[in-house]
């Protein structure tokens, strides 16, 4: 018999993460590497594990992630979003817990585009009075 799997897609900035939850002992594999090899910051790794700790499922699932686009922070946010969605598929009773923590909401903040006549999105060229 095929083993049970739960899927979730997470997005943040320009990163997209395809997350698969498989019953296991709590390992997190990102792009066929351990999470500590892929994401350098311990704070970001804790951020990724947040949905699992909130729902007390940290040791019950192995998390297999395929993520692309963006940087470390965006990828961490996308993975977290994907894990939350996959947990919801595994057990719909987690909805209130995850929703209250804001883990099911897609963070819509994006980089603001650069405008012509300016040095950045809002930074104006230096003003000279004389």
UniProtKB/Swiss-Prot annotation:
<keyword id="KW-0687">Ribonucleoprotein</keyword>
<dbReference type="GO" id="GO:0022627">
    <property type="term" value="C:cytosolic small ribosomal subunit"/>
</dbReference>
<dbReference type="InterPro" id="IPR020568">
    <property type="entry name" value="Ribosomal_Su5_D2-typ_SF"/>
</dbReference>
<dbReference type="GO" id="GO:0003735">
    <property type="term" value="F:structural constituent of ribosome"/>
</dbReference>
<comment type="similarity">
    <text>Belongs to the universal ribosomal protein uS9 family.</text>
</comment>
<protein>
    <recommendedName>
        <fullName>Small ribosomal subunit protein uS9</fullName>
    </recommendedName>
</protein>
<dbReference type="InterPro" id="IPR023035">
    <property type="entry name" value="Ribosomal_uS9_bac/plastid"/>
</dbReference>
<dbReference type="InterPro" id="IPR020574">
    <property type="entry name" value="Ribosomal_uS9_CS"/>
</dbReference>
<dbReference type="InterPro" id="IPR000754">
    <property type="entry name" value="Ribosomal_uS9"/>
</dbReference>
<keyword id="KW-0689">Ribosomal protein</keyword>
<dbReference type="InterPro" id="IPR014721">
    <property type="entry name" value="Ribsml_uS5_D2-typ_fold_subgr"/>
</dbReference>
<dbReference type="Pfam" id="PF00380">
    <property type="entry name" value="Ribosomal_S9"/>
</dbReference>
<dbReference type="GO" id="GO:0006412">
    <property type="term" value="P:translation"/>
</dbReference>
<dbReference type="GO" id="GO:0003723">
    <property type="term" value="F:RNA binding"/>
</dbReference>
């Amino acid at each position: 018999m095929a083993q049970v799997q739960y899927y979730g897609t997470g997005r943040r900035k320009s990163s997209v993460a395809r997350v698969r939850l498989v019953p296991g002992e709590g390992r997190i594999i990102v792009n066929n590497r351990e999470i500590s090899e892929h994401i350098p910051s311990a704070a970001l790794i804790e951020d990724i594990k947040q949905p699992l700790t909130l729902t007390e499922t940290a040791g019950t699932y192995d998390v297999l992630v395929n993520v692309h686009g963006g940087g470390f922070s965006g990828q961490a946010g996308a993975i977290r979003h994907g894990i939350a969605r996959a947990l919801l598929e595994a057990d719909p009773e987690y909805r209130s817990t995850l929703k209250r923590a804001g883990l099911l909401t897609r963070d819509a903040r994006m980089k603001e585009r650069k405008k012509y006549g300016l040095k950045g999105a809002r930074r104006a060229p230096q003003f000279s009075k004389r």
